[in-house]
């Protein structure tokens, strides 16, 4: 190694990470704790080190506990996940279940969901008082549900006969790197109600004829039912 004669402080961030992992593995541990292992690195170096780390840990026979706020990092490297909210751990679940049915708002936020609203169960639907909407969920809604989550990419431009379609006013449009983010106010929403975030391909947004008033829809199965 070209840096074998340097002190730890003289190493770059990536070299320090590699050195730390080598020291850990040299002690032949039965478990490894990785606490935000890439938090101080730029995106390219993080990508390179993540690939190296995943390959190295692939041959590790013990348990790895990976602490992270990065949902992509968790999704790529972990099989099971446990959300900690205000010092309390929630039940351990699979990655698929976390993204499909997070169960709580804390878990939904960690999974990347951007839209939330108070909810009142209505058999197989929910009433959202802040937005003045009743949305079908396509399955029975438990009595304990008090919030719902909607992922930004599940808010869609409504086609003919779309279920859960409603009219909105576009309040703000934000051009992201590869997509367009539109912040919407549903008709009948309370003045202080949170805006609804929709994210779509740039080409799809450019093709919208009326960019001020839109009709959007949310698939029933895409509504996340959340308890406190």
Task: Label every model-predicted segment.
Residues 1, 97, 108, 153, ...:
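Flexible, active-site-adjacent loop/turn segments at secondary-structure boundaries
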Residues 1-106:
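ABC ATPase nucleotide-binding domains
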Residues 11-14, 41, 48, 63, ...:
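Surface-exposed loop/turn and secondary-structure junction residues enriched for glycine/proline
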Residues 51, 105, 119, 166-171:
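Small-residue-enriched segments and motifs
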Residues 57, 85, 118, 191-192:
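A short hydrophobic/aromatic micro-motif that marks alpha-helical segments and, especially, helix-coil
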Residues 99-122, 149:
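C-terminal boundary and immediately downstream tail of ABC-type ATPase nucleotide-binding domains
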Residues 114-116, 125-228:
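Non-catalytic connector elements of ABC transporters
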């Amino acid at each position: 190694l070209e840096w074998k004669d340097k002190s730890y402080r003289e190493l770059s961030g990536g070299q320090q990470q590699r050195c730390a992992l080598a020291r850990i593995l040299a002690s032949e541990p039965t478990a490894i704790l990785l606490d935000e292992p890439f938090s101080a690195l730029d995106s390219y170096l993080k990508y390179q080190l993540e690939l190296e780390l995943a390959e190295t840990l692939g041959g590790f026979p013990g348990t790895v506990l990976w602490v992270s706020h990065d949902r992509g990092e968790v999704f790529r490297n972990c099989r099971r996940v446990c959300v900690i909210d205000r010092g309390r751990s929630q039940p351990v679940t699979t990655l698929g279940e976390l993204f499909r049915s997070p169960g709580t708002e804390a878990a939904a936020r960690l999974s990347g969901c951007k839209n939330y609203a108070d909810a009142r169960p209505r058999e197989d639907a929910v009433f959202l008082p802040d937005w003045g909407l009743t949305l079908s969920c396509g399955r029975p809604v438990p009595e304990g549900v008090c919030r719902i989550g909607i992922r930004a990419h599940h808010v869609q431009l409504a086609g003919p006969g779309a279920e859960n379609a409603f009219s909105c006013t576009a309040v703000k449009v934000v051009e992201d790197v590869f997509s367009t983010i539109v912040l919407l106010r549903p008709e009948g929403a309370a003045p202080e109600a949170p805006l609804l975030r929709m994210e779509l391909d740039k080409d799809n947004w450019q093709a919208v004829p009326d960019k001020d008033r839109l009709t959007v829809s949310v698939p029933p199965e895409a509504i996340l039912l959340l308890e406190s």
